Amino acid sequence: TLFPYTTLFRSKMALQLKKATRKQVKLRLNFSAPSGAGKTYSALRMAYGIVGNWDKIAVIDTENRSASLYSHLGDFFTIDLTPPFSPERYIEAIKACEEGGIECCIIDSSSHEWNGAGGCIEINEILAQTKYKSNTWSAWNETTPKHDRFVNTVLQSPMHIITCTRSKTETIQEGGRVKKVGMKDIQREGWEYELTVSLNLDRDSHLATPSKDRTGLFEGKMPFLITEKTGEEIKAWCETGVDESAAITDAVTKLASCN
């Protein structure tokens, strides 16, 4: 009878109050723009600035091998992802990059995982028709965990990850007329908030403006062109702080020496 209380006591004792410490991180950045704004090109230039080695860069390409159009930049790797664009297939591609020693992975585009052939929207429609009597709301109970696994794979990867997301014009009805109110990512609502930085690219000028920036590198900055230097600045920010893997290795070494 005391077991539940003992377990609760132990779980409370395991919680520790400690000072916040800045740790080294891997980049999670999104480029959002309509087609033709230069998402892939910008992502490749930034990626090279981060890792400085084309052999350590890969593009998961859902855009009919469009990444190969930029092969003149350097000898980066590609994974050609074709339908179905299910979360599981994206996860498989990300894991292949990790196992291949890639340090910066570009997902171009993440939009297909949500709204492409075999993506989450289509998966949910099929589930609704076949298992939930056309009730799409109930079907999301099964579809959402699939999408969440994709998001968690991105967030937990040991690689730097840059995602490219298509955007479209968002409109509202006002006074009987259609009014443009901005651009909307073709991904699940709140996608950009999962990431460290989200940059919007202008279709005509190809200049970037931040919609979210945890780094503080772009705060108050005028629209700017993405170059390798941008990647170098981001790399410096990512590497500021404690290297957790090195700290763990050092602790294990010290522990071994005590024996």
Task: Annotate each language-model stretch with its function.
Residues 34, 144-231:
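Phosphate-binding/switch region of NTP-binding enzymes
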Residues 61-63, 108-110, 163-168:
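A short beta-strand-to-loop transition that corresponds to the Sensor-1 phosphate-sensing loop
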Residues 28-30, 56, 104-106, 160-162:
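Residue-level preference for the first positions of well-ordered beta-strands
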